[in-house]
Amino acid sequence: MPVTLIKALGLAGALAGLGFCAVCQAHEVKTRGLVLHHPWVHAAAAGAMGTDGFVMITNTGKAPERLLGATIEGAVDATLVRAVSPVDANALCQLENGIDIAPGATLVLKPGASGLLFGAVNKSLREDIYANGTLVFARAGVVKIEFYIQAEDSKAAKHSPAGAMAACLASATQ
């Protein structure tokens, strides 16, 4: 029995190494006092008005950091946004000054909260592949990453950059 278990674990490890495990799709980058956990975007066809991206960022450094922006190959640069309404997915406000990350803290960009709103998609972002991109920080500068492209979730918000900014401006004038 122990030999069978060892063989099974070895096979599981080999399959995981080849990408046969959903958990193995998660990836991270450690650099300049930051740990970037599983940056990802929703799949989008070329010509789409935009797509959204998410990541979890842990500041392991001793100084505060600030996320300022992002880029992805295949779409216009991102705008940092936060949701302002739990019932209206298009009610977003632009975070013009970025998002602070205190030393030892973790920033979670996730659907329905804060995220990256990429503009016009000029190259198909197909599901289950990676796209080159960057995250831009105040102290760490430009950090090269790969965004994993995931299917659009039926629960996830569908955004248009113009609609998001209009909603933000409308809420600011009330």
Regions found by a protein language model. Name each.
Residues 27-174:
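Compact, glycine-rich, soluble single-domain proteins
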Residues 20-26:
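Sec/Tat signal peptide C-region and signal peptidase I cleavage site
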Residues 10-20:
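Bacterial N-terminal signal peptides
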Residues 1-12:
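Bacterial N-terminal signal peptides that target proteins for export
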